[in-house]
Structure formats: C-alpha cells, structure tokens
Amino acid sequence: MFIYNITLKIDWSIENDWLQWMKEEHMPEVLATGCFEKSQLLRLIEVDETDGPTFAAQYTAANREAYDRFISNHAPDLRQKSFDKWGNRFVAFRSVMEVVH
C-alpha cells in the first residue's frame, strides 16, 4: 500500500471554509477518481500556528500503479482547482510513503 500525503499550511482567514471544502468537495472528488481506497484529514499539533494551522490530507492507494494513475490523470486538474479557489492563501508539499508493516 502507498500513502499519498499532502501537508498544507493555510491562512487563518480561510480555515473554516477550507475545512468544509476539503471534507465536502475536494477529498470526495479525489476518492471518486477510483485511485485511492480511503482518505483522512489530520491537523498537525505542536507546530507554529502564527501564520495559520497546518493539516495533512492522506490518501491510501492499493499499489504504486493506482498512485501513478492519479498523478498522471487527475492531480494536475485537482491542483489547479485548489489554486483557483484559494490562491496564495495556502502552501502545500507532497510526499509518498510505502507501507512496510
């Protein structure tokens, strides 16, 4: 299994709207691609929140092929939708992890 992790620092001014959008729109749209089996949204603790809270969105793929299919076929459009909606009020970095145990 593979976990696609997106860590996001968001501006305080969008926190409530962004959380609602993630839960009701964005994460369901990612799952609807059929590339991931499940998702979860986490809030990081013990981090500097001066500029805003930090979250991690995690998506679990059964195999590398499913993850690669998402990156090739779906990620560019979904990322653009995020930028179109929120502009520069968030920053994100991505990582991929393989479950070993």
What does each of the following model-derived ranges do?
Residues 33-37, 52, 60-96:
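An amphipathic, aromatic/His-enriched active-site/gating alpha helix that lines ligand/cofactor pockets
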Residues 3-9, 41-72:
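Short, well-ordered beta-strand segments in beta-rich or mixed alpha/beta enzyme
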Residues 1-3, 34:
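Coil-to-beta-strand transition motifs
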Residues 10, 16-19, 65, 84:
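Short, low-complexity intrinsically disordered segments
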Residues 97-101:
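Short hydrophobic/aromatic patches at helix-to-coil boundaries
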